[in-house]
Structures are given as C-alpha cells and as structure tokens.
Amino acid sequence: MKPSERICAALDFPTFAAAEPFARAVAPEVGLLKVGLELFAAEGPAAVRGAARLGRPVFLDLKLHDIPNTVEGAARSAAASGAALLTVHAAGGAEMVRAAVRGAGPGVRVLAVTVLTSLDAAALDAVGLAGPPEAAVVRLARLAVVAGAGGIVCSPHEVAAVRAAVGPGPLLVVPGVRPAGAAKGDQARVATPAEAVRAGADVIVVGRPLRDAPDPAAAARAIAAGL
C-alpha cells in the first residue's frame, strides 16, 4: 500500500456543496474519503454518491448501533448508496455485527468501532467500563472479528494490541491522528500519523488537520511523505 493510500480524508462539513472543493483538492492525494454523521444527516445517500464521483472509495462512518434487524436494513441501504466501508459499534453485540455484515453484502467492508477516541479512562469508568481503555478495545475487537467484521476502528494507542489480538487479516482504521504540533481538539487518545502506522494502522483518518490547512492537498502530501 502506498503511503497516500493509507490516508482517509474526513469530509467534516455541513453540506456537500461546502465539502466538494476540499474533497476535489485532496482526492488525488489520499486513498479514501469519509462521509460522517454531520454530512450524511444533511444530505443522506447523495453525499456518498457525490464523494464517490471523485474517484475514491467512500467510507460511510455512521457508527450504527441498534437492534440487529434495524442495523441489517440500514447496512443494506448504505451498500446501495455506493459506500465501500461502513462503521457499526462493536458494543451492539455479535448478532448486530453479523446482521450488519449480512445487510452490507460482499461489496462493503463492515468496520467495528471499539472505543471512541474522545474517551479516556475516566470517561469510560463513568459509563461503567472500568479499567484501561485497551482492555475494552481488545475485547470488543475480538468479538467483532469473530462475528464477521472486516476491520476494526480504534485509537492509535491500542492499535498494536488489536493487531496482536485479531491477526493480520482485518483492516485497522485509526482516527485520532494529529501531525506533530497540531491541536488535539476533542480527541483524548492521539498520536502522529507515522506513529499510528508504525503501531500497525492500515488506514489513518485525518479530519481537521487537512480541512483547516491553508493548502489541504499539500498537507495531505506532507502527511504521506512522513509515513
């Protein structure tokens, strides 16, 4: 995999009209484009189709978490929109993950989100998940892979432990990456792009450091050069 192919640019914008100039600029420099909740809530499948027209696979990051039947239907609809990857919460349980895989079909890779990168140990303890984040992440990753997930989403702090737990097959997608010196924002468990890849990440998700850069394409090239 070329370094640029490891970068997923997050289209964190309120509308596709706002996202499109950025997406067109970075698409030649990255491997994937991510449509998240904000953009999908505003425009639905049209946002996925618009991003796909730019020639890169689309990562639809909805983090589905509902009863299995509902998630299966949502995954089927996501596949019909043209998404290549789709996220669900591993905490929804093994049957929910299996339902998502059935609904998505063979053309869409279902990724299971373990623990959000905005949560630290204190935040996890407050919601009843006592102990280090790594333990929860590894437990959820194993559950999801056994249930058929094609990949795992985890922070750069846990990616090495997840790789050791699930083996070489699943795609490991890592948000919460920030170039050296960049602001952390609302992320609690972060690392640089190079650190994440060295730890075992296949794909890194980059949002604000690209979106807020004066020249997003140049920023993407700089990240790729450091991988």
Swiss-Prot record:
- What pathway annotation does it carry? Pyrimidine metabolism; UMP biosynthesis via de novo pathway; UMP from orotate: step 2/2
Any single Gene Ontology cellular-component annotation: cytosol
Decide whether keyword Lyase is in the record. Answer: yes
User: Which CDD domains does this one have?
Assistant: OMP_decarboxylase_like
Give, as one word, the top-level EC class: lyase
Binding residue positions for substrate: 12, 34, 61-70, 117, 178, 187, 207-208
Active site: residue positions: K63 (proton donor)
EC number(s): the record gives 4.1.1.23
Q: From the UniProt record, give one GO term of the biological process aspect.
A: 'de novo' UMP biosynthetic process
Molecular function terms, GO-annotated: orotidine-5'-phosphate decarboxylase activity
Alphabetically ordered keywords of this record: Decarboxylase, Lyase, Pyrimidine biosynthesis
Known catalysed reaction(s)? orotidine 5'-phosphate + H(+) = UMP + CO2
Concerning PROSITE patterns, the annotation shows: OMPDECASE
Q: What's the subunit arrangement here?
A: Homodimer.
PANTHER family recorded? OROTIDINE 5'-PHOSPHATE DECARBOXYLASE (PTHR32119:SF2)
HAMAP family named among the record's database cross-references? OMPdecase_type1_B (MF_01200_B)
The family classification in the record reads:
Belongs to the OMP decarboxylase family. Type 1 subfamily.
Q: What does this protein do?
A: Catalyzes the decarboxylation of orotidine 5'-monophosphate (OMP) to uridine 5'-monophosphate (UMP).
Which protein are we looking at? Answer: Orotidine 5'-phosphate decarboxylase
From which source organism is this entry? Anaeromyxobacter dehalogenans (strain 2CP-1 / ATCC BAA-258)
Gene that encodes the chain: pyrF
